Amino acid sequence: MIEVKNLHKSFDGKKILEDISAQFLSGKVNQIIGQSGSGKTVFMKSVIGLFRPEEGQVLYDGRNLVDMSGREVKKLRQEVGMLFQGSALFDSLTVLGNVMFPLEMFSNMTCKEMEERAKFCLARVNLLPEKHHLYPGEISGGMQKRVAIARAIALNPRYL
């Protein structure tokens, strides 16, 4: 379980997060929703250790994120799949390449295994093989979202 307790974060003296607490259960789809500019991205970047909270704790299975080594934090980031409002796809990569990207960065898979895993994830979101060679600008916004979902599940994260 990821447990966030009383998180506070400011930038340039402006409070972005104030006394935020939440729990994320492994194997469940967790959602953070709110108005534009409400701090959702800052919150999630704090949860995965990209931002250090000024106050509060982020606990992974009871261990405080700030007490973990860089290697441990990197491993934890692989266990959290995140989707944002924008699809955040790489325009220079094909649909298949976008889904393979996290596998190339964080897995020990062979090229063939990465391609098979990416194709499996794309099939799970009903993106047909004839779309795999296309670039994000060549597919609809809905298809782009599905590619982003496939990429988020590619590493089989504990938390989504």
PLM features per residue range, with description:
Residues 56-64:
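Conserved ABC transporter NBD signature motif
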Residues 134-139, 143:
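Conserved ABC ATPase signature
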Residues 93-101:
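Short coil-to-helix segment of the ABC ATPase nucleotide-binding domain corresponding to the Q-loop/switch region
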